[in-house]
Amino acid sequence: MKIEKLMALYGENGALLEELYNQYKLNPETLDKEWKSFFQEVDTNGLANGSGYTNGNGKSAVATSFTDAQAASIREMGIINLLNAYRRQGHLAAKLDPLGIQKPNRTFIDSKLHNISPADIDTVVDSETLGRVKLAEIVDLYEKVYCNTIGAEHFYLVNDEEREWLQKKMESPEFLAPLPRGIKLRLFEKLFQADYFETFLAKKYVGKKRFSLEGGESFIPLLDTIVEEAGYHQMDGLVIGMAHRGRLNVLVNIIEKPASLIFAEFEEKTDKDNLSYADVKYHLGYSNSRMTTSGKEVKLSLAFNPSHLECVDPVVTGSVRARQTLIGDKDRSKYMPILIHGDAAFAGQGVVAETLNLMNLEGYTTGGTFHIVVNNQIGFTTLPDESRSTLYATDLAKGFQIPIIHVNGDDPEAVYRVVKLGMEYRQKFKKDFIIDLVCYRRLGHNETDEPAFTQPKMYAIIKNHPPTVKLYEKRLVEEGDIPQEDIDFIKNGSMHGLEDSFQRAKEQDVKIRVDTMQGVWSKFSKDSLDSEPATKLLAEQMHGIVQALTSVPQGFTPNSKLVKLLQSRKEMAEGKIPVDWGFAEALSFGSILESGFRIRLSGQDSQRGTFSHRHAVLVDTNTNEKYIPLNHISSKQAKAEIINSSLSEFSVLGFEYGYSLSDPNALVMWEAQFGDFANSAQVIFDQFISSSEVKWQRLSGLIMLLPHGYEGQGPEHSSARLERFLQLCALDNMQVCNLTTAAQYFHLLRRQMLRNYRKPLVIVTPKSLLRFPASLSPVEDILQGAFREILIDDSGSKPDKIEKVVFSAGKVYYDLMKYKDENKIKNVALVRVEQIYPFPAKEIQSSLKTFKNAKQFVWCQEEPKNQGAWFFVRERIEELLPGNARLVYAGRHESPSPAAGHMKLHLQEQDQLVLDAFQA
């Protein structure tokens, strides 16, 4: 019998039971089988017919006629329900809020709710952890575990092993055992360091923004415990992503960045060689190695990040994935990401869910991220009931089957316990784990803000609430095993250390210096963009690559159409037919792998390719087995990962960017399904990819493939918003290309890896050109050619006969060429700008000297006038034109929408812009 129906036997539910029993006597078939079976048992046990009698207490005669065994069974179920209520809903009764504003709710663990009488509390039961004991002892244990300063949410986990493991750990005597004296002293030391650091900054730099951690100081011992546990678990490194609040504290007290450097940043003592070091101090990252008490050195990296909350999340996880790959960490136990969230941001920012969704995906898993929500119960001036629709800020994570432990920030020992639990869980199950550190914000959003304007009651409470370090000091002294002298020794050491660092920053030549070109980056340059390595492919090298790319293992059955594709690629390599874009890419990939560079390409449908042009991963039609020809070229090659991503742009691009930061020897590529959708990841483009070098001196060789081209598919499938990327271009920060031939694509990919520096590369890739005959390339262009930043086509015209030069980029060139050929125009030269940035001024100037008699100059583009490359190239090209010549525009009119939604209108516009180019 289901517990819900058995509960009906008690008290006020007797009337319902009576009604059901009468219904059973009249027509048993009208009841479900469980009730029918139950009443059959009742009749068998001798319950009298005519069940309307009640006993002296007013209870149903049915309810009073059960055997002792049945009553015992019901009592047992009540006990089970009560204990499971502690496990399931004990967090609601926990004392989590240091301020006492959020009151515990004990409704669900009320013994009366589960029909447990005072006498039942003395029932002897079997316990896995306590043995055969009275129920009262188990309830007492559960009160301490689930309803004190720790609130556990784990009962929703569908994996029985995970759920039971967590319960067993938390309910074991070891979980609540008194902490060793050394651990208590360390917790106090880190708490005091956190508290005093903020106090010190407040005194020395009055009114300066530092985004204080005050009210959440337990965050520092929490992080310190993670580092110590990482050493215990023999981890090699941790990568941390966090926003600005408490960041300076973390840099000094966790990463162990010299405090003198922090003070130098307040003093703005920037090294003259680092004038481009252009970001505020609470956005900066740092890396260091820390020796843990277990004797294991752990590398710590705090990621640089902007003020855009949570956008660093996928960047950190991507960086960790790369580090795991570099050291061969296949079980993902050596490197771990740590993400620090705010309560409002965790619930409010969509990238959090996007990043959580990557947790178990084969191409993105890191073996579990350790999440800490620094829950100060406010977002700037916004309270929780204004910023989320859930009880907890962390409720989102339940859908991803992630355990969540809430803990009161005023209990550092509870914080320590849940960190140890979380680290063990992560290492065992290779899954994310979340600690919700419930604390408060003692000051306003920043040090100049007045929080009492908007939260007067909360800040009246905060004003009178002692700091956590004071509470813990009092607790330690009262417990008696740590004398005041030991506590004072810790205090004095921390205070003197900060004062010494401050004086050094004031009096000595402490300069802010940044050197991100270390480790795997040490062989790369930050300066030269003139490097043009040979990118041609030797014939003998190509032979082995082609053999691998066009073969499948014995017994593997690809789709019949793909058999034809593989055969056609053989013919391309033999020179019988031109090389298409898909095969040009495959050849470049193969040659890059043979050179020892890893390849990682991810995006929506990237294994096949949105336009069915790639087919880098073949699928057996009989078994669904996958085969990647790129990984079977030679025994010495590097590995290729071709990944179908989740349906996300923001998190996946952020992940790949993070990956590229940690592995410059990998060709890392992100492909948008259509370039139009890239703006879903605009924060990553703006805050990281385009600006990380000038802000943080962080380099990246990430390639972004953004399908682009006007083909009548409407405003959402035509434009990668080329103009937006060009607007971001300055100081040689990245490369933007719009290619017109398969060979150009081949050489550009190889150039990206063979250069001795790394810059992001945006390629607005073709769609219809993928198979357009004129854009395909003879194999000789791959064997002998090189990437050319501009391509000139004068169709055999004599240079001195050229009167007009039409510049363009991308697919529109072929429309121009068609018109020129059809109309036998000989006095117009077409110049394709294949690399728009860095702008190829020298090459264009050289071409103009060739056409010395040209008087008219046109820029032709498919995009509307306010979009595309027009506003970017106009001044740059005009500066190169002879005399007072001006550059004339030919293209679509200005429009807020990228493209027309009807094919007829599209064709009219396309014909007109081509006509304008020749008649302008």
Swiss-Prot record:
This protein's record includes keyword Transport: no
UniProt keyword terms in alphabetical order: Glycolysis, Oxidoreductase, Thiamine pyrophosphate
MF annotations from Gene Ontology: oxoglutarate dehydrogenase (succinyl-transferring) activity; thiamine pyrophosphate binding
Species for this entry: Leptospira interrogans serogroup Icterohaemorrhagiae serovar Lai (strain 56601)
Name by which UniProt lists this protein: 2-oxoglutarate dehydrogenase E1 component
Assembly and interaction partners: Homodimer. Part of the 2-oxoglutarate dehydrogenase (OGDH) complex composed of E1 (2-oxoglutarate dehydrogenase), E2 (dihydrolipoamide succinyltransferase) and E3 (dihydrolipoamide dehydrogenase); the complex contains multiple copies of the three enzymatic components (E1, E2 and E3).
Cofactor(s) this protein cannot do without: thiamine diphosphate
GO biological process: glycolytic process; tricarboxylic acid cycle
UniProt EC number: 1.2.4.2
Family the UniProt entry places it in: Belongs to the alpha-ketoglutarate dehydrogenase family.
